[in-house]
Amino acid sequence: MSFDYKKEYKKFYFPPKTPTIVTVPAMNFLAVRGQGDPNQEDGAYKKALGMLYAVAYTIKMSKHKPEGYFDYVVPPLEGLWWQEGIYGVDYTRKADFQWVSLIRLPEFVTREEFDLAIETASEKKQHDFSPVEFFSWEEGLCVQCMHIGPYDDEPVTVAAMADYAKAQGYALDFSQGRFHHEIYLSDVRRCKPEKLKTVIRQPVKCV
């Protein structure tokens, strides 16, 4: 049976619908950086997703099986979001978003395996995949919650997370390298907006 990160690490991918505190360890990802409104038709965000998935499936379907290889389900899309000059995120200013789109990598994928996948995808697709990065990141202490509903309704969930964190003796901590983080568990093309499942995670620190 294929290894499914969502099922094996439910604490990180299926938190309750009420806020909780969690410590997230270091992980490796495929990543593409960009800026602008993610809803823009044929915009940078949608192009980034195309590149991410192309490389993710190149790795999964590769005939080359590196040391430590195991069959797995490609993990869900994730995103880091911020805006210059704003502490947190302002959902009314989508054009100002800076973002990093992510797909988690299995532990057996080294930088060498990543480089091979970029080369293979570029040759097969006749496309430049150089914007895709090997991204290592340790998220650390966070507050998180499962948000169910449209993305534009997220501020209500985010406010509840901030209130919970404060009540537990924590403060939000959008410092260098710490961002608003979302994990997308639903296919937006097939799921009604009111049923979309999104893990929302924000960095905190003890006060």
Model-predicted regions and their roles:
Residues 1-207:
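A solvent-exposed interaction/effector surface
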